[in-house]
Amino acid sequence: MALPALGLDPWSLLGLFLFQLLQLLLPTTTAGGGGQGPMPRVRYYAGDERRALSFFHQKGLQDFDTLLLSGDGNTLYVGAREAILALDIQDPGVPRLKNMIPWPASDRKKSECAFKKKSNETQCFNFIRVLVSYNVTHLYTCGTFAFSPACTFIELQDSYLLPISEDKVMEGKGQSPFDPAHKHTAVLVDGMLYSGTMNNFLGSEPILMRTLGSQPVLKTDNFLRWLHHDASFVAAIPSTQVVYFFFEETASEFDFFERLHTSRVARVCKNDVGGEKLLQKKWTTFLKAQLLCTQPGQLPFNVIRHAVLLPADSPTAPHIYAVFTSQWQVGGTRSSAVCAFSLLDIERVFKGKYKELNKETSRWTTYRGPETNPRPGSCSVGPSSDKALTFMKDHFLMDEQVVGTPLLVKSGVEYTRLAVETAQGLDGHSHLVMYLGTTTGSLHKAVVSGDSSAHLVEEIQLFPDPEPVRNLQLAPTQGAVFVGFSGGVWRVPRANCSVYESCVDCVLARDPHCAWDPESRTCCLLSAPNLNSWKQDMERGNPEWACASGPMSRSLRPQSRPQIIKEVLAVPNSILELPCPHLSALASYYWSHGPAAVPEASSTVYNGSLLLIVQDGVGGLYQCWATENGFSYPVISYWVDSQDQTLALDPELAGIPREHVKVPLTRVSGGAALAAQQSYWPHFVTVTVLFALVLSGALIILVASPLRALRARGKVQGCETLRPGEKAPLSREQHLQSPKECRTSASDVDADNNCLGTEVA
């Protein structure tokens, strides 16, 4: 075909050829994958202006690990390294520092810490590990105090912190860990502190302890090995008569070829006073059971990271939600799960059978002997008999497991902390909302509606560089989640409704805090559940039902008119880039040209954008469509006009607002680029290098055959190669012999350059 028939000059034809080659090299854009489990529908990277966050930090302070919300929800108390802060969080935006009191470890304790081979730069400080509200006028706090735990009371005055008096500092052994790296937990119940931590400098003696209050101080018996020496505590949750401790430790009841971690729940009674003769100053009601969080066909999630209690509307059905990971990696990545445990199931297991250790076989088996009344380990009133206490010393492990319900399973991520709440939707139902911190500094918002599995509404990357989320504190009255980490505290509004610009996008988000307001045509924060005109569908995320005034087909495409059309004036023989914002990671995207698909010969899709060679007949309406949950809707619409030929706007699009925009435009003829917002020079270099390699390969092949023939002639015309015997060093007995001549022509040489029918002279 002649060049004029294509309507292109030679340079434009070369540009078209390179564009087609570029189309083959560019990766195909697909809707995200990213491992097993639900994907976050919207991702916000650090510094994304679409997600407004507030950051508090204080010069000279770090390790903002401990968070406590005041009773009125207006003040956030923060335990940092060697300081305690009071932050006013009533107003939106950055929390305001009300006041701060220092509580450093003494110089003597720091010297002793360094003498014991601990680091002066990272360890020999006072890391605040316990911060609880003792009453309306005092807080109670404990810290590592340079590997010498200490505790004290802090007086409050109008929610301001008063300075700590050194003479009121008490020993904190058993309440705070020695090592800031060790996990711990503590909860204040009826004026008594229940704590789980390490009780020695080496970190080899875990302990569950009760201090403060009028009841006697009680603790676990380390000699009886109720806890494995590597027990790691993550949560303490009070109930009506008991306090539950959640932790993980090495399992001793299983025969396994490697050290097997297991998650546990332990229980002690609030009215426990210890034994009179046996188990003096020790728990007499300590029991523990295995927690099981697993999904069929997968390895168990056997390492618990955090647990919280969500009281239900009915006091008979509260649940505990816990975050788990696995000690094993699958495919080089770790996985996480959130499981729900009914308190009724936990109580039932603790009322079941015991395990006992067979001393002859060293195996744990089910105890089948008689039971006494009252039942050993029960929260009965009055002292226990010596027989019951003797039984409790060896029968502290329950036979049955507490099986949880997996709500969220996700690979490629490790969750560290969890905060939960319920949100009432427009349908009047309560939906579980979970906020999950990760080891890489992300915050996930997950929602569970009814019996359906969890879906991830959003993922927020909090830090430019990955680091773990250390603590989460939900402030319902402020509508925010506070995130503690090494450098400060983030304030994260729990919903970001304004990012959803259409009714379809708002409904598909399935965020119980957001609903579409038809009057203002905005996605708004749901302030009251009785807004009948607002639109929301939490169960199905069905925009067909929520966003249409009348009956609609399954696809929204025929009835979807763009809210605005962006007009683009293009130059002939140029590459035009039409961007398409990917509003949802769950959607698949495609382009249309009017009622038809875009022409494949002159276009390609790269990173969601449409790259289009402007030629005759390519003008008109271009729309980027998203398909999600079975529904298609336009994300963005362009009307492309050429400088040489202006098209009349489709009458069906009359009345739609239009906006003239400039998009990346690159000329493929001999001229320079017209709009160099995005350079395709790297792609051009790639294509050029590949073309040069192909050309070089062809030249090598063409030159190789003559060279081979020349080499064969030179070998035949020269001397015969030495025989193996002639290659050995000459001895005295050997005599030099002249080489024998090959009398043959080049045609008498085989493929290996051997003489054929050679006559030897």
UniProtKB/Swiss-Prot annotation:
Subunit note: Interacts with PLXNB1, PLXNB2, PLXNB3, PLXND1 and TIMD2.
Quote the function comment for this protein. Cell surface receptor for PLXNB1, PLXNB2, PLXNB3 and PLXND1 that plays an important role in cell-cell signaling. Regulates glutamatergic and GABAergic synapse development. Promotes the development of inhibitory synapses in a PLXNB1-dependent manner and promotes the development of excitatory synapses in a PLXNB2-dependent manner. Plays a role in priming antigen-specific T-cells, promotes differentiation of Th1 T-helper cells, and thereby contributes to adaptive immunity. Promotes phosphorylation of TIMD2. Inhibits angiogenesis. Promotes axon growth cone collapse.
Pathology linked to this chain's protein? Retinitis pigmentosa 35: A retinal dystrophy belonging to the group of pigmentary retinopathies. Retinitis pigmentosa is characterized by retinal pigment deposits visible on fundus examination and primary loss of rod photoreceptor cells followed by secondary loss of cone photoreceptors. Patients typically have night vision blindness and loss of midperipheral visual field. As their condition progresses, they lose their far peripheral visual field and eventually central vision as well.
**Residue ranges of domain Ig-like C2-type in the record:** 573-631
**What positions does the domain Sema occupy?**
36-494
Keywords carried by this UniProt record:
Adaptive immunity, Angiogenesis, Cell membrane, Cone-rod dystrophy, Developmental protein, Differentiation, Disease variant, Disulfide bond, Glycoprotein, Immunity, Immunoglobulin domain, Membrane, Neurogenesis, Retinitis pigmentosa, Signal, Transmembrane, Transmembrane helix
Tell me the gene name: SEMA4A
Query: What S-S linkages are listed for this chain?
Result: C113-C124, C142-C151, C269-C379, C293-C339, C497-C514, C506-C523, C580-C624
Pfam families for the chain: PSI, Sema
List the carbohydrate attachment sites: N120, N135, N496, N607
- Cytoplasmic side of membrane: 705-761
- In Swiss-Prot or TrEMBL terms, this protein is called Semaphorin-4A
